[in-house]
Swiss-Prot record:
Function field: Required for accurate and efficient protein synthesis under certain stress conditions. May act as a fidelity factor of the translation reaction, by catalyzing a one-codon backward translocation of tRNAs on improperly translocated ribosomes. Back-translocation proceeds from a post-translocation (POST) complex to a pre-translocation (PRE) complex, thus giving elongation factor G a second chance to translocate the tRNAs correctly. Binds to ribosomes in a GTP-dependent manner.
InterPro entries: EF-4, EFG_III/V, EFG_V-like, EFTu-like_2, G_TR_CS, LepA_C_sf, LepA_CTD, LepA_IV
Domain tr-type G: 11-193
Protein's organism: Streptococcus agalactiae serotype V (strain ATCC BAA-611 / 2603 V/R)
SMART domains: EFG_C (SM00838)
Name of the protein described by the UniProt record: Elongation factor 4
Length: 610
């Protein structure tokens, strides 16, 4: 193809993604678009086709972004090339959304006709506006009995400020309005800008590891073109590779002769080392490099940290390899090696949120067959010491001695909770219980309220989302962003078994709740840890001060069983002998801590706590 033909082809390309709150029908709409454009034969079609991970299909959520090429013949008789990039809707996967939006010129905003705008819808719309995307509102599920499209249309205009007069009324399930959506994409989404004859600049927005072909990069070509045989260079580290194959996904990978400006596809270049490629990096040609890299993504900082340890210690290296492969496919995961006296060798991992942590743990166990112990999640605290230093601590066992601590600051988040009016009281009560500070409250319409609180992140990573859903019967939607660090009265609580600290059970707690929390954990551990031959005291301590204690009684043999009658001194002698043996055992004995003990620190219910 000559340059002119490529430029004409570029004018026919439309890159768009679908953004929505969880469960507003995003993946179903993607299915209908695939059917309508006959990208997938009816034999291969299955519900939520783009959610290819078993975990995604089971939980009914999208975790990974997916990029697919479709051909659509519009009413004007021209054939257009669509690149559909499906994105997740959950707050923990916002990073995936921001990556896919950077590869697009337009976004379809799906809003549920019954539920209206939710917190996550807003968050994703603002991401799309930051990327200067053309936004096409679609009001979905209009066939539901509770649907009220006109109210939702007014909401889109009032709350988001988009012109919704031409919003498509659709039902992805029933296949209504799909053609109208496709026509709007042709008319309203701009063709990609960029020069075919400029030096190559391609943005890596995802990558996956293939055992045979090495790392496969998913890219959006911004300028120039790339074909098999080219020598490409990574702009962040200067590493070069020979391209073996380029192509597109239809969801299956299909090889092509070239990828040109505006295309979204994959590049395979026999890249064997996972660390050589980074999502957000720019690829260029080694013999004709671009002058500067593309504006990448802002690096996401993990919010929640937890220790991951293999149950079988010989699986440590397998766990490292598994984490490296997952990191390639999930750029927001971070990890570093750490050791624990109680659990041996493992990794300290950083996640974007609790669902992200859950999904990573499940993927490690499923895809790589590694059984794991996970320690209680914690956040990054700023510890100011008495000698003027500021330490960033994410692991409770690394906290300095209490005598060295001057003050501790913890991260607060701005939590936006959208909730029906009748549940406002329940939400406010929950937020206060989680040490939240009320900021403001707005009415979206007659029935729905947007409540904003400042809440410590440590309270949110625990079980806030579950509690919010149960106290509002599932009607509340929730989105949060980190706002600031604030000084708080925090203390580190250690758990001692038989006088020895168990580092993996340490946690940070607010001074106010320290006693209840300590008592609760001590009582829980008493039920879980098996009885030993000697008495085991379980203590919760802040520094040197013990705040709660519970004892596991010793198992004992009845040494008096064979004494019938006889002198009392004979019995006493046997009892003293037994006591001395127990004492010796206690001095040298160690207590095995079962896996459930670590999990019990995690599953601290508020109902137990209060």
């Amino acid at each position: 193809m000559n340059i002119e033909d490529l430029k004409k082809r570029q004018e026919k390309i439309r890159n768009f993604s679908i953004i929505a709150h969880i469960d507003h029908g995003k993946s179903t709409l993607a299915d209908r678009i695939l059917e309508k454009t006959e990208t997938v034969s009816s034999r291969e079609m299955q519900a939520q086709l783009l959610d290819s991970m078993d975990l995604e299909r089971e939980r009914g959520i999208t975790i990974k972004l997916n990029a697919i090429e479709l051909n659509y013949t519009a009413k004007d008789g021209e054939t257009y090339i669509f690149h559909l990039i499906d994105t997740p809707g959950h707050v923990d996967f916002t990073y995936e959304v921001s990556r896919s939006l950077a590869a697009c010129e337009g976004a379809i905003l799906v809003v549920d006709a019954a539920q209206g705008i939710e917190a996550q819808t807003l968050a994703n719309v603002y991401l799309a506006l930051d990327n200067d995307l053309e936004i096409l509102p679609v009001i979905n599920k209009i066939d539901l009995p509770a649907a009220d499209p006109e109210r939702v249309r007014a909401e889109v205009e009032d709350v988001i400020g988009l012109d919704a007069s031409e919003a498509v009324l659709a039902s992805a399930k029933a296949g209504i309005g799909i053609e109208e959506i496709l026509e709007q994409i042709v008319e309203k989404v701009p063709a990609p800008t960029g020069e075919v004859d400029a030096p190559l600049q391609a943005l890596i927005f995802d990558s996956v590891y293939d055992a045979y072909r090495g790392v496969i990069l998913q890219v959006r070509i911004v300028n120039g073109m790339v074909k098999p045989g080219d020598k490409i260079q990574m702009m962040s580290n200067g590493k070069t590779f020979d391209v073996t194959e380029v192509g597109i996904f239809t969801p299956k990978a299909v090889g092509r002769d070239f990828l040109a400006t505006g295309d979204v596809g994959y590049i395979a270049a026999s890249i064997k080392t996972v660390a050589d490629t980074r999502v957000g990096d720019t690829i260029t040609l080694a013999n004709n490099p671009a002058i500067e890299p593309l504006h990448g993504y802002k690096q996401m900082n993990p919010m929640v940290f937890a220790g991951l340890y293999p149950i079988e210690s010989n699986k440590y290296n397998d766990l490292r390899e598994a984490l490296e492969k997952l990191q390639l496919n999930d750029a927001s995961l971070q990890f570093e090696p750490e050791t624990s006296q109680a659990l041996g060798f493992g990794f300290r991992c950083g996640f974007l949120g609790l669902l992200h942590m859950d999904v990573i743990q499940e993927r490690l166990e499923r895809e790589f067959n590694i059984d794991l112990i996970m320690t209680a999640p914690s956040v990054v605290y700023h510890v100011n010491t008495t000698d003027g230093e500021m330490l960033e601590v994410s692991n409770p066992s690394e906290f300095p001695d209490p005598t060295r601590v001057d003050s501790i600051e913890e991260p607060y988040v701005k939590a936006q909770i959208m909730v029906p009016q009748e549940f406002v009281g329940a939400v406010m009560e929950l937020a206060q219980r989680k040490r939240g500070d009320f900021v403001t409250m707005d009415y979206i319409d007659d029935n729905r309220v947007n409540v904003i609180y400042q809440i410590p992140l440590a309270e949110i990573v625990f079980d806030f989302f579950d509690k919010l859903k149960s106290s509002t019967r599932g009607y509340a939607s929730f989105d949060y962003e980190i706002s600031e660090y604030r000084r708080s009265q925090l203390v580190k609580m250690d758990i001692l078994l038989n006088g020895d600290k168990v580092d993996a059970l340490s946690f940070i707690v607010h001074k106010e709740f320290a006693y209840e929390r300590g008592k609760l954990i001590v009582d829980k551990l008493k039920k879980i840890i098996p009885r030993q031959q000697f008495e085991v005291p379980i203590q919760a301590a802040i520094g040197q001060k013990i705040v709660a204690r519970s004892d596991i009684k010793a198992l004992r043999k009845n040494v008096l069983a064979k004494c019938y009658g006889g002198d009392v001194s004979r019995k006493r002698k046997l009892l003293e002998k037994q006591k001395a043996g127990k004492k010796r055992m206690k001095a040298i004995g160690s207590v095995e801590v079962p896996q459930e003990a670590f999990l019990s620190v995690l599953s601290m219910d508020d109902d137990d706590k209060k």
